[in-house]
Curated annotation (Swiss-Prot):
Keywords: Cell inner membrane, Cell membrane, Ion channel, Ion transport, Membrane, Metal-binding, Sodium, Transmembrane, Transmembrane helix, Transport. It comes from Proteus mirabilis (strain HI4320). One of its GO terms (molecular function) is fluoride channel activity. Its main location: membrane. The chain crosses the membrane at residues 2-22, 35-55, 71-91, 100-120. This is Fluoride-specific ion channel FluC. It catalyses: fluoride(in) = fluoride(out). The gene is fluC. Pfam families: CRCB. It is a multi-pass membrane protein.
């Protein structure tokens, strides 16, 4: 059990740092749109889908790597809570169009990246 907690801790730390770097670099490009959150969520959706599909095809890989990648890394990288706060803040500021656009972009982007990852691994 301790080794699983350590794996989640390491993966989560790495994913969180990557999310911070992405947001740090991208959020200043478009002040009215949280580009960093969108990119982090889409990358995370791709990685977790690709990882789950990959691990299902490679049963000999130690399951600790799966938990480190999915729960740890992708859990640290993706952020539903930040996405929610950003959307509610936009609604509270009266920027309804931006709020709806942010919701649509995050949901559609994440679903599309998930589907793309599954398709890509199937084609490999």
């Amino acid at each position: 059990m301790l080794n699983i907690a350590i794996a989640v801790f390491i993966g989560g730390g790495l994913g969180s740092v990557l999310r911070w770097l992405i947001s740090y670099r991208l959020n200043s490009l478009f002040p009215h749109f949280a580009t960093g959150t969108l990119v982090a969520n889409c990358i995370g959706a791709f990685i977790i889908a690709f990882g789950i599909a990959w691990f299902s095809k490679a049963p000999n890989i130690d399951p600790i790597w799966k938990i480190m990648l999915t729960t740890g890394f992708c859990g640290g990288l993706t952020t539903f809570s930040t996405f929610s706060v950003e959307v509610v803040a936009l609604f509270n500021e009266g920027r309804i169009g931006w709020a709806l656009g942010t919701m649509g972009a995050n949901l559609a982007g994440s679903f599309l990246m998930t589907a793309f990852a599954f398709w890509l691994l199937r084609e490999m």
